[in-house]
UniProtKB/Swiss-Prot annotation:
Source organism (scientific name): Mus musculus (Mouse)
Protein name in UniProt: CCR4-NOT transcription complex subunit 4
GO biological process: protein autoubiquitination; regulation of megakaryocyte differentiation; ubiquitin-dependent protein catabolic process
Compositionally biased intervals (Polar residues): 281-299, 307-322, 425-446
Location of the RRM domain: 109-189
Region named Disordered: 256-370, 424-459, 553-575
Gene Ontology CC entries for this record: CCR4-NOT complex; cytosol; nucleus
Modifications made to the protein after synthesis: Autoubiquitinated.
InterPro entries given in the database record: CNOT4_RRM, Mot2, NOT4_mRING-HC-C4C4, Nucleotide-bd_a/b_plait_sf, RBD_domain_sf, RRM_dom, RRM_dom_euk, Znf_CCCH
Pfam families with a match to the protein in the record: RRM_1, zf-RING_4
Length: 575
């Protein structure tokens, strides 16, 4: 039934069905006693019940006692009055809600962020798990690009991130607030909303996805502009943080733990694996000059030992495929919300500081071994603030030119030469003059036929020559060290480089034969006199023999003589 206004302020209702009387029922009185009911109830009593008046218990007549239908003029007048009253009622409500136009209500699940660069002003980007999506499930993200001011870094954008849970919103605020991204400081707080203009006018809002309020909000969360300028809404935010901290003291640790789990606990040294000169893939995050140094460096920093499935580091990089714009000039997976870049946000007064996971010494790289200084990719960091070393850029004092050789190899060879010289100097005094004189008494000097050969008289017996050659390795151990260099009895002219040849030529007397240097000192000619009938190794010789030793290493010749065998390179000529 439609509502019908009466002369009174409140509409007349049927006493039986408690429904407002229609316009036609206003002048309907079925009983002579004057008890007024609606025509619906009158018809029901007469057809389904006893047909008696509920007031006087008299039977209802066939026709109502009083019934005066309204004319068209009266009906139009009543409708106009009804419409006017409705307008007055709406106006009264609008006047009562007019003050709500300047009221803002804090939304517990809404995060308001300012200072975003234009590159990050994308709802789909901010919804990703490596960005705001890491703190909880997001209901909606709205970007506001109509920022009226622009700083030195260009215009910035703001964003409204609506979470499903209020706890996730508070966690995001604590992790994002006061962080520097792209040279801009992000500011995050609980967002406020206003009342819908249709709600203020007491009208139906035509927008199905309207984000404004269409009902009265919490009185404790409602603040006027003056109260917000005084910081009342921030006090309310701190109050919510205190309540959440009391219920769950580790609510911040939950988010941090999940980040470390996804990143495999990467350290700042494991963050980089690509060159930082890619402006489209990297950001500069840092404080002051650190950010400038990172952005200006063109040197890529290798990962210090952790496989890059997440890097830096990590950045380990099981999750390096997704790069957060909140990360530093580094391209790996460490998010702006990690502890390395978090700016301390105020903790609610009266509360102990948030528990933080202790830093173990194992989290920092140890000093490498000396031999690994030129091969290890890990650069030791003296302090956590030494970002140049942490990022692997090295010191600016280090020479940048290439030496072209291995310093370790050159030093090792030079040291070996020095040791060799020292040993040769120690062996020279062992050649005493007495031994040289005794040796010379058994030799004679003679010039044999042909130039360029040394002739020697034969020793008294064959065993003396063998014993003489056996002395050579003992007297001159350096000779064996260089035996692979020479293929004959060759004496190089540079005695300084080979100190084992620095002894006098008469020291060859230990060979029990006369050694006369000739113009060609590359060979020795051993000429045996004819009176001996026994040659080297006990081989009988019929006449004078000329033994020419050539193209045989000294060590091989002496070894064969010691064994009593005839060397294969000895050529015997019978005169």
């Amino acid at each position: 039934m439609s509502r019908s206004p009466d002369a009174k302020e409140d509409p007349v209702e049927c006493p039986l069905c408690m429904e407002p009387l229609e316009i036609d029922d206003i002048n309907f009185f079925p009983c002579t006693c004057g008890y007024q009911i609606c025509r619906f109830c009158w018809h029901r009593i007469r057809t389904d019940e006893n047909g008696l008046c509920p007031a006087c218990r008299k039977p209802y007549p066939e026709d109502p006692a009083v019934y005066k239908p309204l004319s068209q003029e009266e009906l139009q007048r009543i409708k106009n009055e009804k419409k006017q009253k409705q307008n007055e009622r709406k106006q009264k409500i609008s006047e009562n809600r007019k003050h709500l136009a300047s009221v803002r209500v804090v939304q517990k699940n809404l995060v308001f962020v300012v200072g975003l660069s234009q590159r990050l002003a994308d709802p789909e980007v901010l919804k990703r798990p490596e960005y705001f999506g890491k703190f909880g499930k997001i209901h909606k993200v709205v970007i506001n690009n109509s920022t009226s001011y622009a700083g030195s870094q260009g215009p910035s954008a703001s964003a409204y991130v609506t979470y499903i849970r209020s706890e996730d919103a508070l966690r995001a605020i604590q992790c994002v607030n006061n962080v520097v991204v792209d040279g801009r400081t992000l500011k995050a707080s609980l967002g406020t909303t206003k009342y819908c203009s249709y709600f203020l006018k007491n009208m139906q809002c035509p927008k199905p996805d309207c984000m404004y309020l269409h009902e009265l909000g919490d009185e404790a969360a409602s603040f006027t502009k003056e109260e917000m300028q005084a910081g009342k809404h921030q006090e309310y935010e701190q109050k919510l943080l205190q309540e959440l901290y009391k219920l769950n003291p580790n609510f911040l640790q939950l988010s941090t733990g999940s980040v470390d789990k996804n990143k495999n606990k990467v350290t700042p040294l494991q963050r980089y694996d690509t060159p930082i000169d890619k402006p489209s893939d990297s950001l500069s995050i840092g404080n002051g000059d650190n950010s400038q140094q990172i952005s200006n460096s063109d040197t890529p920093s290798p990962p210090p030992g952790l496989s890059k499935s997440n890097p830096v580091i990590p950045i380990s990089s099981s999750n390096h495929s997704a790069r957060s714009p909140f990360e530093g000039a580094v391209t790996e997976s460490q998010s702006l919300f990690s502890d390395n870049f978090r700016h301390p946000n105020p903790i609610p007064s009266g509360l102990p500081p948030f528990p933080s996971s202790p830093q173990t010494p194992s989290d920092w790289p140890t000093a490498p071994e000396p031999q690994s200084l030129f091969t290890s990719e890990t650069i030791p960091v003296s302090s956590s603030t030494d970002w140049q070393a942490a990022f692997g850029f090295g010191s600016s004092k280090q020479p940048e030119d290439d030496l072209g050789f291995d310093p370790f190899d050159v030093t090792r060879k030079a040291l070996a030469d020095l040791i060799e010289k020292e040993l040769s100097v120690q062996d020279q005094p062992s050649l005493s003059p007495t031994s040289l004189q005794n040796a010379s008494s058994h030799t004679t000097t003679a010039k044999g036929p042909g130039s360029g050969f040394l002739h020697s008289a034969a020793p008294t017996n064959a065993n003396s020559l063998n014993s003489t050659f056996s002395v050579l390795p003992q007297r001159f151990p350096q000779f064996q060290q260089h035996r692979a260099v020479y293929n004959s009895f060759g004496f190089p002219g540079q005695a300084a480089r080979y100190p084992w040849m620095a002894f006098p030529r008469n020291s060859i007397m230990h060979l029990n034969h006369t050694a006369n240097p000739t113009s060609n000192s590359n060979f020795l000619d051993l000429n045996l006199p004819p009176q001996h009938n026994t040659g080297l190794g006990g081989i009988p010789i019929a006449g004078e023999e000329e033994v020419k030793v050539s193209t045989m290493p000294l060590s091989a010749s002496s070894h064969s003589l010691q064994q009593g065998q005839q060397p294969t390179s000895l050529h015997t000529t019978v005169a």
